[in-house]
Amino acid sequence: MQNISKILVDADACPVKDEIVQIGTKFHVEILFVASYAHRSRKQQGNWIYVDSEQDEVDFYIYKHAKATDLVITQDMGLAGLLVKKGVYVLSPRGKFVTDEQMDTILYSRYVSAKLRRQGTYTKGPKSFSKQDRQSFLTSLEKILSNYKGIL
């Protein structure tokens, strides 16, 4: 794994912002939260970039600015698919490291679900975010940054 130069966060609906600040600060990694103006919050730690509230503006910003030495935290698998092709590291808020090898399956599943919705059939969405998901994220992020810093 190359050195992680910064963490970019798809922050609009990210449930682990505090954890990102906690672990990123511990490892002295720059953190950049990207959100739409519609999701502006008074409680802000770290560096924030706000973009227009148009659909996918956050994704466009992250895609344009992410480099192969960056880690992006997102639950948007469409964005993740584009980023892994650029060599960007991608981690979901549930602690799953997204790889290029997984993307065909992930995107096909997303396509099938969208097709079913257009036909009026709705599948179950993701389960509620749990304490286990939060812990899995913390463990994964710390492991990634520890490997980068040569600690583990």
UniProtKB/Swiss-Prot annotation:
CDD domains: PIN_YqxD-like
Source organism superkingdom: Bacteria
InterPro entries xrefs: UPF0178
NCBIfam families: PRK00124.1 (NF001095)
Entry's family note: Belongs to the UPF0178 family.
Annotated protein name in UniProt: UPF0178 protein Bcer98_3021
Species, as recorded: Bacillus cytotoxicus (strain DSM 22905 / CIP 110041 / 391-98 / NVH 391-98)
